[in-house]
């Protein structure tokens, strides 16, 4: 009956035409009169339900429940929420609108789009403007759908509309939860299969949902080998499709593809993806979180700041907000942009097909954000955006891109992306020196060269099947500037497979542990300068498994140590497994290897060698010292091999001291036995960085506050303390934690959480919440 009422109240086509052509200031506005249902005439001034082409305002103090599934033709021009608009959680709803602005203001002006007025903190005594499309405690029910269609209306600013914008208000989108938004394949999926097996059971997936099965071979995504299908059946760990697969997808052994569900029952979409697309934006001092919502066909192509999902210059004012389980797909401008924003938690999200980088940290000031267990699929190359903050970014299509590494990246997978899976890029220019204002652990701000900031944590990440050049490009362009040897970049438990260039490490001071690479090139174009590698496997490479310093420049600046290096099934074709660098401009360059193994080595060339100069240009050595390579224990305990180039100063000074020893040496390298050479320790890591804690959820039940949160640290977290009590560790290292506290009858109640790590560092800037409902 509510739908019929809406149609009857607005029936004059002439009004639509007039509203569309009128100037924004002349368009009639209808305001709420009281709290009530959208479909109730008594809720609105004049007793008239909002009609197509109108401006609508929910006034301060009013709570309006959106309870209609309006026809697509009924498009509200703009919706200004100064009070609260909440979508009915138990019935299907649809809202077509040109602009939603969540702001505590009586104005219905469509200007001031960038919310500059909210640079200063708003008065805490004033109520927030609120948009609730479900809440974390009561999401939109699984059997219904809430749909917002962002629809361009003639006369609106094309560069900014249609849009949803939150200006110091609260904006929440919460759909029915899924146990997993994406999982690994449990068995191989072959061409012609109409059913696949998942690596684990899932709940929340249903017949009719759209899924994607990721490409698993190098370069496949150019032919759209990441395949979309519709679920036709589900049984246990098996999912059936409407159509058979057209390609094979790996699903056993060490490397498996992924299957991801794109659908949610809370949807924000562009009404005209081929025309003017919509975008969403949170501004400074806003609040709210997102869980299990779908953002599809959003993002304005080639337009700065108009992204599918955008946290814009929020600083630390949105600490406590999170994006969990979201699906962001078909974007013309990124999936999720974190711009000048700290402490955001992004977990279990799926990004599929974007123009330009996918999960994107925009301007180099972002710190203490957590990106955990997200899947990035087919971020495709775009163009540089006009007036972008960092001019060096070519927007070439990285699954994950950042310029400031002081963030946490864990358990993420980048599959079938454009130029990069993971890309850290910070290149100074004549106009930009990269000394930027960065928040410190105590909350103060300091001017820091962002190239000197290492990861909080980079662990358990994976990249495969890139259609462009790189799996993981760490710091190409930093010009040898990075953290010192006591605060190195640390990369742990990384898988890189079926890409062209596996790992390009160009930062100084780097510790890599437990990395597996299966690609055309292994460790490529490295800047070996205080680099430490432990337990590295390079498999099935055909060219330059372990490249010389800076590739064709053949130059090494510092110490390299490798402890545990296995080459498996490499097809080197006369190329050495380990290349020697020619030049040593600092005089300190040297390489030490221990535990080198070559398994199933496929090379019938007479130039077969473990250590040699290798292919590519042969620059004439220019420095007084070369770069010797020590293979510890090669001749037995305490009997080490010193391998040098036959063009090096060391060889030319004492040629009789060296000899050929295939397959260790090749046509341009020889070896001398040396005794008991020390295996150096070029890094001396210390942990002086305090942990970072975020309260992500607070709910009141049975007289208690039930509190959830996350914590990140570069070392081991010893404890999380909330109001003087220790929280429970839900996942390792307190990545997620929980606690229950007695709810005090007085309001508001203050909740304070901080963490302490095993090195004795205590968080200097606890997360403090005053007033706990609604949250955040």
For the regions a language model picked out, list residue spans one by one.
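Bacterial N-terminal signal peptides
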Residues: 2-9
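Extracellular beta-helix/beta-solenoid repeat scaffolds
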Residues: 53-184, 203-229, 233, 238-282, ...
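Acidic/polar low-complexity surface segments
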Residues: 98-132, 136-161, 178-179, 183-184, ...
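Extracellular beta-sheet-rich ligand-binding/adhesion modules
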Residues: 16-155, 169-176, 180-186, 190, ...
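Long, low-complexity serine/threonine/glycine- and acidic-rich segments characteristic of extracellular
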Residues: 686-690, 698-700, 704-706, 712-775
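Right-handed parallel beta-helix
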Residues: 44, 264, 288-297, 319-332, ...
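C-terminal accessory/interaction regions of large nucleic acid-associated machines
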Residues: 528, 535-683
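Short edge beta-strand/loop segments characteristic of extracellular beta-sandwich folds
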Residues: 197-199, 214, 706-712
């Amino acid at each position: 009956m509510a739908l019929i009422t809406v149609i009857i109240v607005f029936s004059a086509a002439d009004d639509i035409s007039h509203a569309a052509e009128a100037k924004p200031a002349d368009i009639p506005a209808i305001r709420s009169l009281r709290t009530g249902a959208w479909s109730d005439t008594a809720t609105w001034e004049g007793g008239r339900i909002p009609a197509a082409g109108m401006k609508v305002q929910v006034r301060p103090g009013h709570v309006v429940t959106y309870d209609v599934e309006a026809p697509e033709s009924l498009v509200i021009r703009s919706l200004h929420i100064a009070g609260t608009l909440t979508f009915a959680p138990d019935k299907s709803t649809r809202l077509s609108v040109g602009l939603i602005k969540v702001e505590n203001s009586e104005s219905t002006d469509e200007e001031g789009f960038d919310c500059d007025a909210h640079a200063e903190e708003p008065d805490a005594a004033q109520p927030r403007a609120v948009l609730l499309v479900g809440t974390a405690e009561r999401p939109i029910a699984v059997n219904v759908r809430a749909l917002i269609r962002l629809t361009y209306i003639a006369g609106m600013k094309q560069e900014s509309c249609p849009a949803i914008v939150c200006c110091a208000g609260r904006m929440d989108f919460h759909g029915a939860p899924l146990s997993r938004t994406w999982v690994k394949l449990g068995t191989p999926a072959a061409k012609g299969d109409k059913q696949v097996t998942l690596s684990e059971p899932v709940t929340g997936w249903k017949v009719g949902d759209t899924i994607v099965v990721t490409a698993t071979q190098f370069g496949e995504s150019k032919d759209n080998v990441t395949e979309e299908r519709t679920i036709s059946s589900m049984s246990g760990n098996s999912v059936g499709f409407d159509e058979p697969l057209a390609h094979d997808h790996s699903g056993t052994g060490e490397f498996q593809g992924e299957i991801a569900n794109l659908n949610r029952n809370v949807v924000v979409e562009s009404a005209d993806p081929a025309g003017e697309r919509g975008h969403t934006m949170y501004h400074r001092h806003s609040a709210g979180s997102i869980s299990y919502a779908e953002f599809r066909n959003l993002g304005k192509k080639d337009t700065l700041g108009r992204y599918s999902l955008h946290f814009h210059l929020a600083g630390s004012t949105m600490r406590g907000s999170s994006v969990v389980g979201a699906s962001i797909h078909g974007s013309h401008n990124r999936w999720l942009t974190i711009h000048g924003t700290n402490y955001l938690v992004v977990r279990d999200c799926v990004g599929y097909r974007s123009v330009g980088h996918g999960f994107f940290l925009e301007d180099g000031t972002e710190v203490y954000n957590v990106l955990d267990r997200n899947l990035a699929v087919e971020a495709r190359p775009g163009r540089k955006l006009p007036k972008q903050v960092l001019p060096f970014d070519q927007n070439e299509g990285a699954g994950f891109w950042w310029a400031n590494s002081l963030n946490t990246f864990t358990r993420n997978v980048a599959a079938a992306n454009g130029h990069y899976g993971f890309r850290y890029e910070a290149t100074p220019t004549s106009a930009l020196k990269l000394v930027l204002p960065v928040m410190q652990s105590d909350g103060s701000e300091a001017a820091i060269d962002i190239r000197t900031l290492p990861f909080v944590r980079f662990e358990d990440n994976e990249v495969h099947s890139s259609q462009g050049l790189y799996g993981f490009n760490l710091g190409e362009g930093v010009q040898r500037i990075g953290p010192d040897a006591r605060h190195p970049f640390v990369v742990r438990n990384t898988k890189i497979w079926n890409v062209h260039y596996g790992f390009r490490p160009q930062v100084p001071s780097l510790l890599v542990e437990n990395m597996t690479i299966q690609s055309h090139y292994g460790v490529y174009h490295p800047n070996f300068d205080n680099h430490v590698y432990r337990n590295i496997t390079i498999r099935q490479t055909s060219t330059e498994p372990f490249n010389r310093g800076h590739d064709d420049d053949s130059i090494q600046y510092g110490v390299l140590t490798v402890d545990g290096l296995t080459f498996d099934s490499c097809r080197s074709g006369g190329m050495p497994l380990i290349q020697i660098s020619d030049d040593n401009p600092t005089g300190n360059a040297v390489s030490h290897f221990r535990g080198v193994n070559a398994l199933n080595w496929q090379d019938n060339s007479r130039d077969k060698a473990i250590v040699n100069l290798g292919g590519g240009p042969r620059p004439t050595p220019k420095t007084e010292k070369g770069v010797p390579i020590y293979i510890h224990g090669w001749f037995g305990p305490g009997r080490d091999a010193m391998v040098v180039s036959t063009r090096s100063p060391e060889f030319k000074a004492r040629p009789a001291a060296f000899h050929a020893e295939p397959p260790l040496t090749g046509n341009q390298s020889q070896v001398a036995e040396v005794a008991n050479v020390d295996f150096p320790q070029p890094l001396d890591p210390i942990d002086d960085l305090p942990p970072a804690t975020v309260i992500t959820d607070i709910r009141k039940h049975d007289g208690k506050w039930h509190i959830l949160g996350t914590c990140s640290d570069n070392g081991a977290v010893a404890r999380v303390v909330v109001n003087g009590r220790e929280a429970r560790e839900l996942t390792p290292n307190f990545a997620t934690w929980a606690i229950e506290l007695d709810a005090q009858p007085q309001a508001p109640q203050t909740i304070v959480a901080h963490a302490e790590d095993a090195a004795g560092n205590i968080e200097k800037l606890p997360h403090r919440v005053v007033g706990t409902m609604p949250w955040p």
